[in-house]
């Protein structure tokens, strides 16, 4: 690939997209043309200079439960510098291969460890550790319920759920940390249908139930707007006269779904 700038950023939508392969291929061709190019990577998580079991790093494990990523101490970094740094299994496993490729291309490898390749300074940007820990625990819980939904829909198996249950245990996460969980379950039990709940910035918990025209998520958002705006329950933000023709168009004319809520 022809490049015109001294710094080239290679990005892609997710893991396994070929970012590293593209960079190493370019590195090889640059050296063949006499260009002394280099390679570094920005990977936000896990954060190398936070503890291995810090909630932020555990949240990364939760986010990649489907990939079965595991945070670990970088053994190459520890051997080279005598210092502990957090990395993850895929980077550690592939480093000997990368090292050999660098030596073949450049004559010598510029890196002593996979952590050396990173330019991540996110850990130094944390100004309130307690807030980050709380947000990480909520994210772990969210990932757990997402995995449970994916399993219920047949899009995933038991392994991601089991992995997330282990991460929750390590991070001291239970459903009780989020008041919306118990509120949604109670609403679903009392109404006999799917329900949702949300914690507002002021701590109030708002719920939403399934009706003939609205799903739980839609009802929840409308109820949250009413709560924030100080609008009483007796008022409808969207009249049934507005919703009914939309539902009829969807189910009877366009036939996009048998249910107006889908």
Predicted regions mapped to residue ranges:
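Extreme N-terminal, non-catalytic leader segments
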Residues: 1-6
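Glycine-rich phosphate-binding P-loop
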Residues: 7-27
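Short beta-strand-centered segment that lines the nucleotide-binding/catalytic pocket of NTP-utilizing
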Residues: 35-48
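Conserved nucleotide-sensing/catalytic segment adjacent to the nucleotide-binding pocket
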Residues: 51-91
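N-terminal leader/propeptide and maturation segments of large enzyme subunits in energy/redox metabolism
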Residues: 95-155
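Short, compositionally biased leader-like segments
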Residues: 143-180
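Conserved mixed alpha/beta catalytic, RNA-binding, or beta-rich assembly cores of soluble enzyme
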Residues: 174-193, 199-200, 204-253
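Conserved small/polar residues in nucleotide/adenosyl-binding loops
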Residues: 255-260
């Amino acid at each position: 690939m022809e490049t015109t700038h001294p710094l080239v950023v290679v990005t892609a939508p997710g893991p396994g997209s070929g970012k590293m392969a593209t960079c190493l291929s370019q590195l090889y061709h640059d050296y063949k043309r006499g260009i002394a190019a280099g390679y570094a990577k920005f990977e936000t998580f896990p954060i190398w200079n936070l503890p291995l079991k810090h909630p932020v790093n555990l949240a990364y494990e939760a986010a990649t439960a489907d990939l079965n990523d595991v945070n670990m101490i970088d053994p190459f970094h520890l051997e080279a510098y005598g210092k502990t740094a957090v990395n993850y299994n895929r980077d550690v496993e592939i480093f000997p291969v990368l090292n050999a490729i660098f030596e073949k291309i450049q004559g010598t490898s510029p890196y002593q460890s996979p952590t050396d390749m990173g330019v991540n300074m996110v850990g130094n940007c944390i100004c309130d550790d307690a807030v980050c820990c709380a947000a990480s625990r909520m994210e772990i819980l969210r990932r757990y319920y997402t995995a449970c939904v994916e399993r219920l829909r047949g899009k995933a198996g038991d392994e991601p759920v089991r992995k997330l249950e282990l991460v929750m245990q390590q991070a001291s996460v239970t459903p009780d940390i989020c008041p919306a969980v118990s509120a949604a379950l109670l609403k679903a039990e009392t109404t006999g249908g799917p329900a949702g709940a949300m914690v507002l910035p002021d701590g109030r918990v708002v719920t939403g139930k399934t009706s003939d025209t609205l799903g739980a998520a839609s009802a929840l958002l409308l109820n949250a707007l009413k709560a924030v705006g100080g609008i009483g329950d007796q008022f409808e933000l969207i009249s049934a006269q507005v919703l009914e023709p939309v539902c009829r168009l969807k189910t009877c004319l366009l036939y996009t779904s048998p249910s107006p809520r889908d």
